[in-house]
């Protein structure tokens, strides 16, 4: 089980990303717009750099919803491989069966 503070830190990052998503998209659109003037693009780049670091979605880490484990997480389920295996063996994940051929 991961430390509670790490799980809470990731939750705080997710909240920050949601909060600034629209503003980041707007600034990135200006920066990537070929028709925008150089001054507008520079101003947008400055504003983007002034946003909090944790507002960037790249800084998020996928964590297991049950244990908080940062590695081995299946993004389709949001659960770490070890917990996913336990749930599958108990039949608690619908539509997943053990492979046999």
From Swiss-Prot:
Gene Ontology molecular function, alphabetical: rRNA binding; structural constituent of ribosome
Entry keywords, A to Z: Ribonucleoprotein, Ribosomal protein, RNA-binding, rRNA-binding
GO CC, any one term: small ribosomal subunit
InterPro entries for this protein: Ribosomal_uS14, Ribosomal_uS14_bac/plastid
Biased composition (Polar residues): 47-59
Keyword Ubl conjugation in annotation: no
Pfam families assigned to the protein according to its UniProt record, in alphabetical order: Ribosomal_S14
Sections of the chain in a coiled coil: none
GO biological process terms, semicolon-separated: translation
Record bears the keyword RNA-binding: yes
Ranges for region Disordered: 36-61
Family indicated by similarity: Belongs to the universal ribosomal protein uS14 family.
Function summary: Binds 16S rRNA, required for the assembly of 30S particles and may also be responsible for determining the conformation of the 16S rRNA at the A site.
Oligomer and partners: Part of the 30S ribosomal subunit. Contacts proteins S3 and S10.
Record-given protein name: Small ribosomal subunit protein uS14
Organism: Methylobacillus flagellatus (strain ATCC 51484 / DSM 6875 / VKM B-1610 / KT)
């Amino acid at each position: 089980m991961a430390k509670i503070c790490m799980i809470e830190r990731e939750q705080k990052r997710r909240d920050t990303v949601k909060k600034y998503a629209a503003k980041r998209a707007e600034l990135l659109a200006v920066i990537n717009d070929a028709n925008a003037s150089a001054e507008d693009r520079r101003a947008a780049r400055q504003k983007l750099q002034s946003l909090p670091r944790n507002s960037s979605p790249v800084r998020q880490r996928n964590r297991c919803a049950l244990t908080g484990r940062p590695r081995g997480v299946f993004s389709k389920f949001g659960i770490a491989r070890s917990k996913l295996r336990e749930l599958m063996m108990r039949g608690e994940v619908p539509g997943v069966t053990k492979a046999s051929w």
